[in-house]
């Protein structure tokens, strides 16, 4: 009998958590170590910003390590500490993308199984898991342009009802000036970085139905100290993300529709609007082998100004060689057409295809 797609998703894409090694378990305290090493061989013209030509590379693709400590107090109460690091290069010229160890997530949690949990620190927000589209490396959905999916935050999550997750987050500034210059004061939020924000969201995944929605209002520092023209600086983004899907359990098939809308308020300039729709699917081709893909149409426009339309498609196949070893082939193609007043239409294309291997531990 085919596995349900929920089991496939958990088994294939969250294996690092499921297979984490318990290194200490005594008197209500549990400590786990886990992570993955991930490498991809690819041909792409969009690995780096402003890249023009397509190149072949063998590089790091999200390798990370995490440690989680949980202390149970009794009566359903618990405290948890979580730290996750990434291997990231500081230099664009480092083609393998293996570099310094940085902190990706670091937070503490206080919670109760019946009342929910409060999370403090650099963590994922409720917006992170809203959309349903699957990808390993070349995701065509730019959710963070609508609502930030992680950051320095205070968050509350409730999971007391089977299949339902409710959440709210307050984001704080994470990037601040370290040195004094003519245009910067130490301790102030870096220009065009997040100043603060709020998010609320809900997601339901049960009885073969998937439904989710999140709303966020994010404020940015405008960079008013910059000399010259100060207009056009991002001040605030109001965004929403949603998903609706149905799981055909007997067929091993999930079909979904993701969408988003955002309005950006700019300093002394016209506002910008963007939206996208993205139908997608995930299908169990055979045991331990899955096929997935999605299409996206996105439009970005300024009142009586520049307009951009993007069509993008992603397709991939993954196969579990072992419960802790996943290999995949994934490709994506995107075409963006930009129109501006009295200017010739500009067309940009992004093409990527890669073969990846993940080893979890």
UniProtKB/Swiss-Prot annotation:
User: Subcellular location, in the record's words?
Assistant: Cell outer membrane
Membrane disposition: Multi-pass membrane protein
Q: Which UniProt keywords apply?
A: Cell outer membrane, Ion transport, Membrane, Porin, Signal, Transmembrane, Transmembrane beta strand, Transport
The transmembrane residues are none
User: Which Pfam families does the record associate with it?
Assistant: Porin_4
Q: Which InterPro entries match?
A: Gram-neg_bact_OMP, Gram_neg_porin_domain, Porin_dom_sf
Recorded GO CC terms: cell outer membrane; pore complex
Set out the biological process GO terms recorded for this chain's protein. Answer: monoatomic ion transport
Signal peptide location: 1-20
Quaternary structure?
Homotrimer.
| UniProt cross-references to PANTHER family, sorted A to Z | OUTER MEMBRANE PORIN F-RELATED, PROTEIN YDDL-RELATED
Q: What does this protein do?
A: Forms pores that allow passive diffusion of small molecules across the outer membrane.
Question: What protein am I looking at?
Answer: Outer membrane protein P2
Specify the species. Answer: Haemophilus influenzae
Tell me the organism's taxonomic lineage.
Bacteria, Pseudomonadati, Pseudomonadota, Gammaproteobacteria, Pasteurellales
Q: Which gene encodes it?
A: ompP2
């Amino acid at each position: 009998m085919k596995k349900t797609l929920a089991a496939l998703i958990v088994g294939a894409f969250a294996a690092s958590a499921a297979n984490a090694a318990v290194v200490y378990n005594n008197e209500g305290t549990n400590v786990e170590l886990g992570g993955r090493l991930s490498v991809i061989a690819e041909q792409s013209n969009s690995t780096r910003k402003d890249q023009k030509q397509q190149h072949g590379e063998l590089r790091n693709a999200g390798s990370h390590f995490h440690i989680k400590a949980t202390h149970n107090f009794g009566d359903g109460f618990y405290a948890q500490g979580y730290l996750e690091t990434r291997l990231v290069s500081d230099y664009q010229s480092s083609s393998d993308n293996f570099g310094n160890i940085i902190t990706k997530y670091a937070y503490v949690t206080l919670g109760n199984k019946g009342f929910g949990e409060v999370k403090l620190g650099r963590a994922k927000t409720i917006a992170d898991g809203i959309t349903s589209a699957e990808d390993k490396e070349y995701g065509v959905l730019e959710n963070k342009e609508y609502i930030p999916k992680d950051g320095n935050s205070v968050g509350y999550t409730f999971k007391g009802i089977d299949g339902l997750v409710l959440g709210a987050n307050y984001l704080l500034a994470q990037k601040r000036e370290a040195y004094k210059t003519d245009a910067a004061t130490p301790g102030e939020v870096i220009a065009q970085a997040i100043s603060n924000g709020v998010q609320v969201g809900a997601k339901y995944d049960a009885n073969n139905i998937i439904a989710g929605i999140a709303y966020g209002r994010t404020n940015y520092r405008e960079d008013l100290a910059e000399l010259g023209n100060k207009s056009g600086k991002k001040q605030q983004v109001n965004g929403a993300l949603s998903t609706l899907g149905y799981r055909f359990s007997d067929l091993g098939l999930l079909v979904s529709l993701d969408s988003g809308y955002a309005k950006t308020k700019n300093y002394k300039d016209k506002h910008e609007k963007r939206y996208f729709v993205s139908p997608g699917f995930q299908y169990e081709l055979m045991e331990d082998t899955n096929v997935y893909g999605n299409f996206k149409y996105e439009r970005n426009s300024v009142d009586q100004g520049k307009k951009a339309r993007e069509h993008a498609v992603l397709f991939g196949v993954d196969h579990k060689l072992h419960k802790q070893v996943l290999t995949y082939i994934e490709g994506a193609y995107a075409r963006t057409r930009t129109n501006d007043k009295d200017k010739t239409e500009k067309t940009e294309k992004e093409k990527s295809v890669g073969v990846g291997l993940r080893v979890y531990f």
